[in-house]
A protein has these predicted regions:
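Short, surface-exposed beta-edge/turn micro-motifs
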Residues: 3, 35-36, 148-150, 165-166
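Conserved beta-strand termini and adjacent loop/short-helix elements that scaffold enzyme active sites
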Residues: 22, 74, 96-98, 145, ...
Length: 174
């Protein structure tokens, strides 16, 4: 096999360097612009496992990489907006959209600084029950950055019975 180099965003969480690789495939041109490093995947491996150490080559100054805020979890346009505002202040927020539960797992494992989430519990409460379940004794701060109303949009007037007979296109992953 051949060694492979994968573009990634890197940041320092507590005392560990964390790399978040960009997905392979379409859109790679923007990955070059947004990446902070290249990760080396050895020739004898197809991929790296989560948490596995590897060599990385920084493409930004070390001091910049140390100040990156890694945000992993649900995709929320508000985070993108905040990242744009932070950039003007010299703060780089790098987000990866993996879904609320995967974001909480990354936060628990120390792989990110922040985890956007929107999880509705069986009792109708958002987020707090999941934090209590997965972070029992740890000190966390839950910041509500906004509320939103979501729905299903259609060109035709539909009722709930029509949901079974129509096709829907889901949003992006995360």
């Amino acid at each position: 096999g051949f060694e492979e180099f994968v573009q990634a965003i890197v940041g320092k969480v507590q005392d560990k360097w964390i790399a978040v690789p960009f997905p392979r495939g379409a859109g790679r041109q923007m990955h070059v612009v947004r990446s902070h490093a290249f990760l080396k995947v050895p020739a004898n491996k197809k991929t790296l496992k989560t948490g596995e150490a590897t060599d990385a080559h920084l493409t930004v100054p070390h001091t910049m990489a140390e100040q990156v805020v890694l945000v992993t979890g649900s995709h929320d346009p508000a985070i993108d907006y905040l990242a744009d505002l932070a950039k003007d202040a010299g703060i780089h927020i790098a987000s990866s959209h993996v879904g609320s539960m995967n974001g909480l797992a990354a936060l628990r494992q120390g792989f990110c600084h922040l985890a956007p989430m929107h999880l509705l519990s069986d009792d109708g409460e958002y987020n707090t029950p999941y934090l209590k379940k997965h972070f029992s004794e740890e000190e966390l701060v839950l910041i509500c950055i906004g509320e939103r109303i979501q729905g299903i949009v259609s060109k035709e007037i539909l009722g709930f019975d029509d949901i079974l007979t129509h096709r829907f296109i889901n949003r992006q992953k995360g």
